[in-house]
């Protein structure tokens, strides 16, 4: 556990999860967050049924209901598979410190750069989430009417009469923070782990280009051992991406379906509302959805593209003067690198920028259809 918390590329998200006892420990904090947020999400979906007819209200409430549903789903999967996540992060810690001991200035510079990037993204995501969540909770105070941050229908309770209104409002404000911690760290975890995948891939590329440095032209045995080590590193990277995919693929599938639909609905809502404050709010919701999806697809696409560049690195290495047996080993690396390492949506479609563009195109197509029907 200490090795995970001391590994800088994943420690930010690991510490948040550990605080809420989702991983690395098991105490009451887990239930203090999961159970109330799950109950609140259930009442949010009940409220959707009672708001049917007012499409503007339904879309806004649907956005928050889907957002909290995804937060609960992410957390339940994380808790259910916590041993898999802990073992995965333990492996990251081991490989991270192994790479940090490589005596190569370019590799160390690469490791520092990607570590800083991962930590900055994790911290900024949490800070941005806290700011936006605060805006969600205080916005109803400035509307001039009694409203809640998130629509809720509790059978037998009038949520807009005192003192029920004040109690429900306070509960929603309190639960917003754990809800934020249930949702955002998973996105940051995905980004951090894909960035570490890129570190491993680029390290392998560098070593393929320089593995013969310091080895004499007649020391083929040492060169052969180096190439065998590089093949093992390549296999380790393949296993790493496969394990990462198994942890996130179905969550990515739910995100693909839910946020694709919500993006379409919010674009439609943006087209029909006239209140300037609501336009700003809806535009912020759209930005959050697009940035969330883009973070997934951009980094997954980078892993895919760089994994294929391993073949280029192997071919551009010092292979000309090597024995045929070593050349054949390098050829195996080149052949395997032709098959890209992919993170997929539900083990069906690879997460690429082309797929991201297709999702945006589909959402916009449904939006134009809705607009024509509405007009």
From Swiss-Prot:
Disruption phenotype: RNAi-mediated knockdown does not affect mosquito blood feeding rate. The keyword Cell membrane applies. Pfam families: 7tm_6. One of its GO terms (cellular component) is plasma membrane. It is found in: Cell membrane. InterPro entries: 7tm6_olfct_rcpt (IPR004117). The keyword Lyase does not apply. GO terms for molecular function: odorant binding; olfactory receptor activity. The chain crosses the membrane at residues 32-52, 58-78, 125-145, 167-187, 250-270, 279-299. One of its GO terms (biological process) is signal transduction. It is a multi-pass membrane protein. This is Odorant receptor 10. It comes from Aedes albopictus.
């Amino acid at each position: 556990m200490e090795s995970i918390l001391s590994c800088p590329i994943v420690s930010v998200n690991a510490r948040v999860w550990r605080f809420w006892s989702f991983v690395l420990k098991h105490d009451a904090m887990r239930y203090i967050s999961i159970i109330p947020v799950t109950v609140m999400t259930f009442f949010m979906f009940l409220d959707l049924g009672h708001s049917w007819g007012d499409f503007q209200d339904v879309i806004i409430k649907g956005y928050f209901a889907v957002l909290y549903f995804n937060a609960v789903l992410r957390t339940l999967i994380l808790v259910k598979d916590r041993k898999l996540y802990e073992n995965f992060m333990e492996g990251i810690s081991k490989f991270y410190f192994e790479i940090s001991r490589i005596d190569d200035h370019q590799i160390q510079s690469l490791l520092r750069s990607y570590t800083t990037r991962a930590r900055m993204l994790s911290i900024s995501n949490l800070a941005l989430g806290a700011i936006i969540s605060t805006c969600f909770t205080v916005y109803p105070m400035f509307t001039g009417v009694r409203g809640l941050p998130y629509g809720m229908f509790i059978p037998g309770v009038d949520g807009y009469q005192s003192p029920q209104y004040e109690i429900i409002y306070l509960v929603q404000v309190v639960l917003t923070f754990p809800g934020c911690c249930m949702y955002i760290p998973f996105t940051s975890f995905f980004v951090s782990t894909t960035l570490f995948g890129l570190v491993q891939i680029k390290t392998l590329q560098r070593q393929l280009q320089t593995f013969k440095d310091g080895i004499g032209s007649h020391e083929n045995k040492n060169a052969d051992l180096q190439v065998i080590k590089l093949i093992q590193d390549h296999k380790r990277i393949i296993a790493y991406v496969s394990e990462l995919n198994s942890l996130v693929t179905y969550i990515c599938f739910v995100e693909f379906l839910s946020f694709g639909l919500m993006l379409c609905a919010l674009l439609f809502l943006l087209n029909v509302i006239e209140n300037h404050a609501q336009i700003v709010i809806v535009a912020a919701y759209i930005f959050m959805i697009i940035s969330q999806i883009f973070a997934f697809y951009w980094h997954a696409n980078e892993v895919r593209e760089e994994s294929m560049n391993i073949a280029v690195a192997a071919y551009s290495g010092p292979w000309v003067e090597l024995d045929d047996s070593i050349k054949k080993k390098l050829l195996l690396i080149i052949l395997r690198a032709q098959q890209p390492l992919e993170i997929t949506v539900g083990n069906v479609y690879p997460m690429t920028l082309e797929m991201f563009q297709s999702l945006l195109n589909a959402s916009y197509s449904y939006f134009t259809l809705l607009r024509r029907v509405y007009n």
